[in-house]
Amino acid sequence: YIDKETMILHHDKHHATYLANANAALEKHPEIGEDLEFLLSDVTRIPEDIRQALINNGGGHLNHALFWELLTPEKQEPTAEVLAAIEDAFGSFEDFKTAFTQAATTRFGSGWAWLVVNQEGKLEVMSTGNQDNPISQGKQPILGL
């Protein structure tokens, strides 16, 4: 359960600010385009004068966009395909939940817990600080908290 005030704060303040700041940075270099996933997948593509702004704010936008996309008012179970991949990677769904909870609760300061697909096509749990997105490490996020 996440209370209404927390949701409003994250949507109307945090996410809106990340998006505005990412757009402001991109306006300084229209030649690089606006595909944040592409840019963050290799941050050397981003001009140095806006690199950290895009890592922070572009990452914050992508992180929150995925978070909103995955929210649902009702409890949902993973599909058979996802459950099989989780069991292959973690042994059981309970072991996955333990690993994900540990990633979320042991992050010092601000950050995210992730279920990602790594470069080998396998699922893994990881944590990133602040608004860093796993895309910058060559991993595709599929669940973030």
Swiss-Prot record:
Its EC number is 1.15.1.1. One of its GO terms (molecular function) is superoxide dismutase activity. Fe(3+) binds at H10, H64. Gene3D superfamilies: Fe,Mn superoxide dismutase (SOD) domain, Iron/manganese superoxide dismutase, C-terminal domain. Keywords: Iron, Manganese, Metal-binding, Oxidoreductase. Binds 1 Mn(2+) or Fe(3+) ion per subunit. It is an enzyme of class 1 (oxidoreductase). It holds the Pfam family Sod_Fe_N. Mn(2+) binds at H10, H64. It comes from the Bacteria. InterPro entries: Mn/Fe_SOD, Mn/Fe_SOD_C, Mn/Fe_SOD_N, Mn/Fe_SOD_N_sf, SOD_C_sf. Its cofactor is Mn(2+); Fe(3+). GO terms for cellular component: cytoplasm. It catalyses: 2 superoxide + 2 H(+) = H2O2 + O2. Destroys superoxide anion radicals which are normally produced within the cells and which are toxic to biological systems. Catalyzes the dismutation of superoxide anion radicals into O2 and H2O2 by successive reduction and oxidation of the transition metal ion at the active site. Belongs to the iron/manganese superoxide dismutase family. This is Superoxide dismutase [Mn/Fe]. It comes from Streptococcus alactolyticus. The gene is sodA.
